[in-house]
Amino acid sequence: MTTVGFDVAARLGTLLTAMVTPFSGDGSLDTATAARLANHLVDQGCDGLVVSGTTGESPTTTDGEKIELLRAVLEAVGDRARVIAGAGTYDTAHSIRLAKACAAEGAHGLLVVTPYYSKPPQRGLQAHFTAVADATELPMLLYDIPGRSAVPIEPDTIRALASHPNIVGVKDAKADLHSGAQIMADTGLAYYSGDDALNLPWLAMGATGFISVIAHLAAGQLRELLSAFGSGDIATARKINIAVAPLCNAMSRLGGVTLSKAGLRLQGIDVGDPRLPQVAATPEQIDALAADMRAASVLR
């Protein structure tokens, strides 16, 4: 970890759950369950939570719901964890408004995804991220996920954005460990693994931590993995990484939203079903997920 990475770890955390958004039976936002889930995840070892990200079904929630959710989670965890707000959309002006609203509510940082659907050029990406970073004083993470946004943030664009004082890191979900390692060395930006299957490799490359989906179900194990790696016990870190691999396999079948909501229900935490176009797991999928969770020792 670089000096900047250590600072970002203190400001934003090292084990962050990309938290689901709980919904009631009628599909409305369930802030009471969100508060309970947030406390549960912190109790299990998370020192950060991301709300209204991909796994939080951000495309299906209104700005008002995003702020209600942020407020509920901030009130629930207090000073026990950092709360990062997803503020990225495919519209720069909208992203700026949302970032300002999240900052006013007390978010500790922002996660801003690459604008999706419109496929902007790299020059447009640089201008977009710069404009959002200019809008508040909060530390901001770039969210690089071309599998969903169609366009990657190219290494030279990330290097250029690294000069902005509010842009402090990257959530990488494109599996480019080689470029990530070079960018960390060149810029001091903190990197977070955005792909649970690559958590340990990212640590080996110098990443600060994880923004994790499987932490919904295995936060304790991931905290142990981070602790083992940090103390130089690589054998234990590898053992834990292998142990949670069935959850990554399940996520590849179900997707992060369906996996997390079904898995939490199996663990006794009902966060409701996804909003369309995401869907709840079928009975057959739940049976297969339960087997994977037992294999990962997160379900009895």
UniProtKB/Swiss-Prot annotation:
<dbReference type="GO" id="GO:0005829">
    <property type="term" value="C:cytosol"/>
</dbReference>
<keyword id="KW-0457">Lysine biosynthesis</keyword>
<keyword id="KW-0220">Diaminopimelate biosynthesis</keyword>
<feature type="site" description="Part of a proton relay during catalysis">
    <location>
        <position position="54"/>
    </location>
</feature>
<dbReference type="InterPro" id="IPR020625">
    <property type="entry name" value="Schiff_base-form_aldolases_AS"/>
</dbReference>
<feature type="binding site">
    <location>
        <position position="211"/>
    </location>
    <ligand>
        <name>pyruvate</name>
    </ligand>
</feature>
<keyword id="KW-0456">Lyase</keyword>
<dbReference type="GO" id="GO:0019877">
    <property type="term" value="P:diaminopimelate biosynthetic process"/>
</dbReference>
<dbReference type="InterPro" id="IPR013785">
    <property type="entry name" value="Aldolase_TIM"/>
</dbReference>
<dbReference type="GO" id="GO:0008840">
    <property type="term" value="F:4-hydroxy-tetrahydrodipicolinate synthase activity"/>
</dbReference>
<dbReference type="GO" id="GO:0009089">
    <property type="term" value="P:lysine biosynthetic process via diaminopimelate"/>
</dbReference>
<comment type="subunit">
    <text>Homotetramer.</text>
</comment>
<dbReference type="InterPro" id="IPR002220">
    <property type="entry name" value="DapA-like"/>
</dbReference>
<comment type="pathway">
    <text>Amino-acid biosynthesis; L-lysine biosynthesis via DAP pathway; (S)-tetrahydrodipicolinate from L-aspartate: step 3/4.</text>
</comment>
<feature type="site" description="Part of a proton relay during catalysis">
    <location>
        <position position="117"/>
    </location>
</feature>
<dbReference type="Pfam" id="PF00701">
    <property type="entry name" value="DHDPS"/>
</dbReference>
<comment type="function">
    <text>Catalyzes the condensation of (S)-aspartate-beta-semialdehyde [(S)-ASA] and pyruvate to 4-hydroxy-tetrahydrodipicolinate (HTPA).</text>
</comment>
<dbReference type="GO" id="GO:0005886">
    <property type="term" value="C:plasma membrane"/>
</dbReference>
<keyword id="KW-0028">Amino-acid biosynthesis</keyword>
<protein>
    <recommendedName>
        <fullName>4-hydroxy-tetrahydrodipicolinate synthase</fullName>
        <ecNumber>4.3.3.7</ecNumber>
    </recommendedName>
</protein>
<dbReference type="InterPro" id="IPR005263">
    <property type="entry name" value="DapA"/>
</dbReference>
<feature type="binding site">
    <location>
        <position position="55"/>
    </location>
    <ligand>
        <name>pyruvate</name>
    </ligand>
</feature>
<comment type="similarity">
    <text>Belongs to the DapA family.</text>
</comment>
<feature type="active site" description="Schiff-base intermediate with substrate">
    <location>
        <position position="171"/>
    </location>
</feature>
<dbReference type="InterPro" id="IPR020624">
    <property type="entry name" value="Schiff_base-form_aldolases_CS"/>
</dbReference>
<feature type="active site" description="Proton donor/acceptor">
    <location>
        <position position="143"/>
    </location>
</feature>
<keyword id="KW-0963">Cytoplasm</keyword>
<keyword id="KW-0704">Schiff base</keyword>
